[in-house]
A protein has these predicted regions:
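Helix N-terminus capping/helix-initiation residues
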Residues: 1, 42, 95-96
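Short, basic/hydrophobic alpha-helical segments
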Residues: 1-15
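Generic preference for hydrophobic/aromatic residues in regular secondary structure cores
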Residues: 2-5, 39, 68, 132, ...
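Conserved beta-strand -> loop -> alpha-helix junction used to position metal-binding or nucleic-acid-contacting
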Residues: 15, 19-20, 27-72
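Acidic/histidine-rich catalytic cores and adjacent linkers
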Residues: 20-25, 73-193
Length: 193
């Protein structure tokens, strides 16, 4: 397919891919015949892969996901269902974690200052029984949120400016202030490299 496009309109200057094995092989074969064509990684997929490498080995992350599943099940069909965590997607789940982290942060604040809908009485005991486990993630939630901030800033920059000579330096100056914890600093370096 790539050769067909190249015959019709000339070899592309660059090919953006999501780093899947099949496409990587095709791009590598194409580059043999067209060495001036460069391969660029799709930024959202690249960031999702970096995030997966960061979070998957962390036992706190798997514990958190299991806790979210329990909270989702326990809150269904209750007056607290409006607080249920968003459903996590099996496919491309690391591309959609910002919603889960935002939910956890907002629900954690809700635990401290609950404001129930007008027609729903507050049952503090039930609220704590279902969502109180979020308290044990206070420290790491801030770390995870910083990763989400780094990802969002990177996506915004690349979507607006594209890939260009000097992009690394520009991103470094935008991301360094966001690297305020032990988890974020190496993550910024991985994003930039």
């Amino acid at each position: 397919q790539l050769e067909k496009v190249a015959r019709a309109s000339g070899a592309p200057r660059a090919i953006v891919s999501d780093q899947c094995r099949e496409l990587n092989n095709a791009v590598e074969q194409f580059q043999v015949a067209h060495p001036r064509t460069v391969r660029l990684n799709d930024i959202k997929h690249r960031l999702a892969l970096l995030l997966e490498r960061q979070l998957k080995p962390d036992p706190r992350w798997s514990d958190f996901l299991q806790a979210c599943q329990r909270m989702r099940k326990k809150s269904q069909q209750t007056p607290l269902a409006f607080l249920a965590p968003p459903a996590t997607k099996e496919k491309a789940r690391f591309m959609n974690l910002d919603e889960l982290i935002r939910w956890a942060t907002a629900t954690r604040k809700f635990l401290e200052h609950p404001q129930m809908p007008a027609d729903v009485p507050l049952d503090r005991e039930r609220l704590e029984a279902i969502f109180g486990a979020l308290r044990s993630y206070d420290a790491v939630l801030a770390d995870w949120q910083s990763l989400m901030d780094i990802i969002e800033t990177t996506l915004r920059h690349v979507r607006k400016e594209g890939y260009y000579h000097g992009c690394e330096a520009a991103l470094r100056s935008e991301l360094t202030p966001l690297a305020g914890n032990e988890m974020a600093r190496p993550f910024v370096e991985q994003v930039i490299s």
